[in-house]
Each structure stands twice: as structure tokens, then as C-alpha cells.
Amino acid sequence: MERTLVLIKPDGVQRGLVGEVIARLERRGLRLVGAKFMQVSQELAETHYAIHKGKPFYDGLIAYITSAPVMAMAWEGPNAIAAVRQTMGATRPTEAAPGSVRHDFGLEVGRNLTHASDSVENGQAEVSLWFTEQELVSWSRALDPWIFE
């Protein structure tokens, strides 16, 4: 069972899209195992986006992600990484598939509404960065056998 981090970034929160994103992921069959509405600290932002340090957009990215609250979530399910990334759409909203969150609501890459882990390894690392074990809930739904083999 894979776990993945999903962030609804400040633009998604400000536009009132938290419920829309959660609904799409739940309809997809994924299970929410952790969630918190939070203001991102400078330290957390710099750790999360360390891979981009030194790139021209880094300072703006850090300023943006710390500018307003985000909704941080951990989701779980078979193939959760791929399922979430499909549901969110390509990083650039203009290249995202119709029906994806970014296609339906985004216009620019700098305001692309969400972040989603891009690999199983990054999913594990990012969930651990944003959540303590005590903040994650292991549970099952009665309908899980109808979704998962």
C-alpha cells in the first residue's frame, strides 16, 4: 500500500478548492490517513523544496508556499502515487489532461494549486517530513474490498 503527500497550496486554499480536491481523491478510491490545515514555516518549506535550491524560481517558491495556509494531506492506496498524480494533472496546467484538477482550475505553473509526491520513495520521505506517526491514522472502510483487490 503506497502513501503519498498531497498539498493544496495557498492558491488552492484561497480559491476554496480544498473540498473539491478531497472529493476527487476520495472518489478515486484513495484513503485519507492524515490531514492538517497549516501555515508552512520557512524551515519546512526549505527542507521540502531543497532539491530546487539554487534554481531561479527557488526564492519565489519559498515565499509563495509560506505566504498563506496550505492543506497538507497523506493519502493511501494501491498505486497511490500514480493515481494522485493523474488526478492532479501535469505540473503545467496548460499541459494537464482534461478532467484533472490542474486542467480544470489552473492557468499558470507558478499557481498550479497542488503538490503531489512523484515516487514511492519521495512519498514516504515527504509524508514523514510533514506528519508524525501519531498524526497518521491506519483504518479501513467497509467498501475497501470493492475498490482494492
Language model regions located:
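Non-catalytic terminal and connector segments of soluble metabolic enzymes
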Residues: 1-149
